[in-house]
Each structure stands twice: as C-alpha cells, then as structure tokens.
Amino acid sequence: MSDREHLSSEPYKGVRDFYPDDWSKLTQVFATIRNTLESFAFEEYNASPLERAELYEQKTSEEIVSEQTYTFEDRGDRKVTLRPEMTPTFARMLAAKRREIPFPVRWFSIPNVFRYERPQRGRLREHYQLNVDLAGIADMKADGEIVVIAHTLMKALGAKDSDFRIRISSRTLLAAACAATGFDNEEAIRIYSRLLDKKSKLSIAEFESALGPTRSDPLKAIESGEDAKVAEEKKKLEDFIAALKERGITNVVFDPEIVRGFDYYTGIVFEIYDTNPENPRAIAGGGRYDNLTSLFGGDAIPCVGFAVGDVTLMDFLETHSLAPKPQASADVFIGTPSESDIGPASLFGEELRTNGLRVLVNKTSKGLGDQIKEASRRGITYFIAFGEQEAASGNVRVKTLESGEEIELSKADVSGHVK
C-alpha cells in the first residue's frame, strides 16, 4: 500500500461506531431495561451471533431469509447465518435444556442482530434488540403479562400513555376469518398474512389487486363477526383487551391489520406504535408462538414474547425528548498546579476511589485554567486543585463547576459531600 492509499475510517455501511457519549446514552437505556425486567423476575441470557442457516429457513419470514440475512459457507462447508433475530435461538436453547431448566422460563436478552437491508431512519444492518420471552404457560394470562411488561418498560423510560399506542390482534382470529372467506389451506393463509402485513405500504387498489378478484377480504369477516368461529375468536380478543384496561393499560386498541411478519406466530400479536406524527412507526412488537420448539423434536413448548430494537427505541425517545444525556466518566477532577503535585494528587485520588468515587487525576503539564476547561468539557461536576498547600494542610477546596460555588472541606469529608 503506497503512502497515498489509506484505509477508510468509515464503518461498514449500515452499522455504527459507538463513541463514549453515544454508548453512555445507550447503556443507560439498557440499565433501565434490565432493572424493569428483573423487577418481573426475568433472567438475562445470551448466545453466539452465529447460527446454522437452517434455523431461520424453517419459520422466519421468507423475505428476511431470502433477501436480508448475512449467510455464508464456513471453511467446513457449513451454511452459517449471522442471526437476524433472537427468537429462534431462544427456542433452540429452550429445546436443548428442556429437562434441566425450571419452567415457566422467564428470560430476556439484548443481543446484536444483523439484516442486510437499505439503511434508513429506524433501520440499520446491525442493531441491538431486546427480547423478552415467557415459556411454559399456554394460558392467555401469560400473554397479558407480556403486554403489561412492555407497557411498564415504556413508562420506565419516561413515556406517557399518550405517547404510544398498543395495537393488538390475533393470528387465530385471522385464521378463522380466512377460513370463513375461502382461504382453505395454510399456504393461502400465509400468503394473505404477508399481504396484510404490507397493507399500510399499498394503495387500496394495489391491495385489492394483490388479493385477487375472486377473493373476499377476511378483514370484512372480522368486522361483521357473522361467522361463529370468527365471532368466538373476536370475543376472546375483546375480553383480553378489557382485562388489560382493568389493569390500567388504557392505550390498548384492537387492530385486525396487525399480523407481525414472522411465520411462527400462533395467537395474540401486538405492536407498540409511536403516536407522534414526526415518528409514525412501530417501536416494538411480539406475540404468542407455541410451535417453534417442536422443530427440534419433542412436545411443543408454549411461548409468548416481544422485541424492541434500539434504533427505533432511541428514535422514539429522541422524538419525545426522553433520551438520556451522556454521563460523565468521573465524579471529581483533581487538578495539579505543577507537575510535582501529580504524585500526591494521585494518592488523594486513590483515597477517594476507595470510598466509591470515580476520579480523574490530571497527568499533564496543562495550567489549572485549562484543566478546569477539560473537566467542564467532560461534564465532570466537581473540581479540586491539589497542590503543596492542600497536601500539607489536609484541607481542599471543592468547586462545583456549573455554579462556580466553592466549599472548603477536610480530605476525609470530600467523599460524603460529592456523593
């Protein structure tokens, strides 16, 4: 490589570099997520991003598998995929240890996932995705708890009920409506489900053309409720929504057009939508999937869960002015009037660290004025100039940089003041 040929400093298209301020904001959101889920007794898990490609070829959306996965052959001629989602991995892990782990399983993870798609607002080729799953309970009370957890998480992140809407439907209701309107096999229902999932992106004419002239739209069967099975499934869903409202979730609505794009859903499905017109999109989604573990042999394990991508979540938080600010890397900056003061100042810094403070000690030849500017630029709250006088007297002046206020304290009292 010649001197004129330099490597690009840009990241791969569609992925991000997280500089400290960016990572600080994201990790604060992750901390809120973890605290919320742990309050519901959920346990965190993780797995490798590399999976056998066949894991996704069975039940993941055909569009994702054929057009959006990073799939390749390794040096052992095995077909490998960078995970585009976590749910199949969760099902695989569940099936592998089903006789060893206690049920019901309450797990969550925040892995990075990969999809080869056109980068745009809310979509990148790599992102972090919260996955929350409850396995081993077939009763709809589990579905209710999952929706409650999703709602609680949004509130924990600072959102008001008016900021988002939970839109709910049911795959069993849709299947009943399809059967009532002549969609008489699974493949026909699957094709219609995929069409319905894209309806918001189509004109009325385009949707009706794709449906075909001989087909009656199952949505009309749901609306009328004349078919007995459709009416039965619709009543179950209405009762489910009523139970959520009794628990204080008032921003939940029935929306028969919600189907979710994955083939493995079998029951309740839901999406959380931003109500702000500046960001009209889904933030999160999930539902019940009772058959996915049967791909690995043995009886199916009933499961329900939801997922939230960090890109859409941060867009939501920023749209509603809820995004956290970067946290400072230190509580205290200890400045040194001269280079000879660095040693004693470092010892004082060690004392403060043993008391639980995060401390940055100047190691440069900068003047105190420049050190104060550095501390301010880093967002550090307190500044202490530590020279010969402070080392001899045992007292220091603690300056609050934002207000300029100073207070004199003994070295022993600094930790209590800063905390």
What are these regions (language model features)?
Residues S2-N251, P256-Y264, E271-N279, N291-G297, ...:
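Extended, charged alpha-beta segments that form solvent-exposed binding/catalytic grooves
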